[in-house]
């Protein structure tokens, strides 16, 4: 699963990408310093793995991972191919969710592509380009569906949904703001609309706003805008995050304490991104390895077993499950079993985040 980091030139998105991935994507104070998207594979922070590692002392600990793609800065006219626009839009099509970085700080030394700091204008600039691209996509699908309607009346339902979406897009709103039924979503699932992708907004703030980001009027504006899309906003100072990313262990902990934070803003971004993708983790624990496995929310036990090995899914008998909280409270799997806290679940069991599992199977 991939998240695309987007933003206008010079808002801090490549610096954030560098900090998240430590991949050293080229970063400079001029537009288009990222042309081909840089891709970084990032471990998802999970304190539960640290606790299990203390209990099992495993040979290795493996985190769940997600991919971030740093997509070059979009500009007005991208949907018409301006500013390498076609390339940018094709890169956005390839990601599952969007992380949009907006600038919420003043600094005369960092140029803004539009000459002034206005995060709502920046959001609109990008969203309108995505909306224009979606209108073009919807029009093509409508033409096709109307031709097919002559031979098969079932296409009327698809036409109805597409026209409903087009109306909202033409009002300058994203497709994700529309309430659609599961049936309607199914009808347009192959339309791949850019503004249907889930979105997370990153408000890049100054160091002086770290203690109380809510006092920043620009952040408030972004939060108000995001409400309509049921989107989350994470304020963070990307400059400070870059410093934090260069530190390890105690040094990082000391700096976090000095600025009054429990965890880095980037850790919050990664966790929120994982959730945005509709993902969660189940855990396996033993002396060889403590590991988090990525699954979609709503996944049943046999499908989760298949993440480990296809043979386990094929020969699934049952899943022996204990919750993370119960295991930590009791101190060992033996104690948890004695208390009756280890459950036996069958094929219809829907996995929960943090389930610690041993799959029984036979092939």
Predicted regions and their residues:
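Structural motif
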Residues: 352-357
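Conserved Switch II/interswitch segment of TRAFAC-class P-loop GTPases
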Residues: 40-45, 72-82, 93-155, 168-181, ...
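Glycine-rich, flexible loop/turn motifs
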Residues: 23-31, 38-40, 48-51, 80, ...
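C-terminal-of-GTPase-core extension/linker across diverse P-loop GTPases
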Residues: 2-6, 17, 144-350, 362-363
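Conserved metal-binding segment of the jelly-roll/cupin
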Residues: 70, 359-360
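A ubiquitous short alpha-helical element
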Residues: 56, 126-130, 238
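Conserved G1/Walker A P-loop phosphate-binding module
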Residues: 1-111, 139-140, 145
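Amphipathic alpha-helical transducer elements in NTP-driven molecular machines
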Residues: 32, 46-49, 62-68, 82-96, ...
């Amino acid at each position: 699963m991939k998240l695309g980091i987007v933003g206008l030139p010079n808002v801090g998105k490549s610096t954030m990408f560098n900090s998240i991935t430590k991949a050293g994507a080229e970063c400079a104070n001029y537009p288009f310093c990222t042309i081909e998207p840089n891709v970084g594979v990032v471990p998802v922070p999970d304190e539960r793995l640290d606790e299990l590692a203390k209990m099992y002392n495993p040979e290795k600990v493996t985190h769940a991972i997600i991919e971030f793609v740093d997509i070059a800065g979009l500009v007005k006219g991208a949907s018409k191919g301006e500013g390498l626009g076609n390339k940018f839009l094709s890169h956005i099509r390839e990601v599952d969710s969007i992380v949009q970085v907006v600038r919420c700080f003043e600094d005369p030394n960092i140029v803004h592509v539009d000459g002034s700091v206005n995060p709502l204008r920046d959001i609109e600039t990008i969203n309108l380009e995505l909306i224009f691209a979606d209108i073009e996509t919807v029009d093509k699908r409508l033409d096709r569906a109307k031709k097919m309607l002559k031979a098969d009346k079932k296409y009327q339902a698809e036409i109805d949904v597409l026209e409903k979406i087009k109306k909202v897009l033409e009002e300058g709103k994203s497709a994700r703001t529309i309430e659609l039924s599961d049936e309607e979503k199914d009808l347009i699932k192959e339309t791949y609309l850019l503004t249907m992708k889930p979105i997370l907004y990153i408000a890049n703030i100054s160091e002086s706003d770290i203690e109380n980001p809510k006092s920043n009027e620009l952040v408030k504006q972004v939060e108000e805008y995001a409400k309509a899309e049921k989107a989350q906003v994470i304020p963070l100072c990307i400059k400070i995050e870059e410093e934090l990313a260069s530190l390890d262990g105690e040094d990082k902990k000391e700096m976090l304490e000095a600025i009054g934070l429990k965890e880095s803003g980037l850790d919050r971004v990664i966790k929120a991104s994982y959730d945005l993708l509709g993902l969660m983790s189940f855990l396996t624990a033993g002396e060889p390895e403590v590991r988090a496995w990525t699954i979609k929310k709503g996944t049943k036990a046999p499908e989760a077993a298949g993440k480990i090995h296809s043979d386990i899914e094929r020969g699934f008998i049952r899943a022996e499950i204990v919750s993370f909280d119960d295991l930590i409270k009791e101190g060992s799997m033996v104690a948890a079993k004695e208390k009756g806290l280890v459950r036996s679940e069958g094929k219809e069991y829907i996995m929960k985040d943090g389930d610690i599992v041993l799959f029984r199977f036979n092939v």
